[in-house]
Amino acid sequence: MPGFSSPAIILRRTAYAEYDTILDLLTLERGRITAMAKNARKSKKRFAGILEPFCCLDAVFTDPSARSGMTILKEAAMTAPFGAIRLNMEKVAYASYWSEMVNRWVKEDDTQSALFHLLHYVLFMLDSGKASHADLSILFQVRFMTLAGLFPGMAACRVCKTEIDRLSGSPTLYLDIARGGIVCHRCGGEGAGSQYRKPLSRGLVKQFLWVRETDLPQAERMRFTAAAREQGLAALEAFVTYHLAMEIKSLKVLQRIRHW
């Protein structure tokens, strides 16, 4: 039966029937796919210990058959277990949030090689413990929104069109979630308490733009103050869920257990 091979990251797994497992994966070659691992929960040799969430595999698949319409995971070898993530509840929550974002946004068989490399990179860094969980989430969300064509307009106020470098007075800006970009303190002050308008310092906006435009290893070195981190995550998470137009269940878990 025709098939294909590809590096793949496990986004989600679901038990199916008595012994099978359904996997949602982001693959380098085909984008997001759903595949069945037959007898995965019965065999102790074939897929032993490698079908865990966030694992990266070299995988071989059969193309969907006319009868079942299901892609089959034929064989797989672990390339990166990212096991340290699953030993820490907060790491699991962040990785689950990123994975759910990808799983909900990427269409099946829509190749997203840049997104694959982005997700692999942040999972690698999260597993290594070399970077702040929250800073990695800012990096991921900024780059994800850029790839998805959803990144908010941050060069100028969406209302008065004044460029941020030309604004005088208060350094506080607001991310107007419904307008899809920032508004200045003069145009955004009235709705400052709204769930659809989140405060952002001018310095944080510039950090977002730098993270968006530089290469990944350099962007990962960006460090945020505690206040900027909390402000940035509140704004980005609200923006992502609004513009993806869907509930991201893992985000609620993350927000309950997150340690600042």
From Swiss-Prot:
Keyword tags: DNA damage, DNA recombination, DNA repair
Its GO biological process annotations read: DNA recombination; double-strand break repair
Q: Which Pfam families is this protein grouped with?
A: RecO_C (PF02565), RecO_N (PF11967)
An example of a Gene Ontology cellular component annotation for this protein is: bacterial nucleoid
| UniProt-listed InterPro entries | ARFGAP/RecO, DNA_rep/recomb_RecO_N, NA-bd_OB-fold, RecO, RecO_C
Q: Which residues cross the membrane?
A: none
What PANTHER family does the record tag this protein with? DNA REPAIR PROTEIN RECO
Family from the record: Belongs to the RecO family.
What is this protein for, i.e. what is its function? Involved in DNA repair and RecF pathway recombination.
- Protein name in UniProt: DNA repair protein RecO
**Which species does this protein come from?**
Desulfosudis oleivorans (strain DSM 6200 / JCM 39069 / Hxd3)
Q: Which gene encodes it?
A: recO
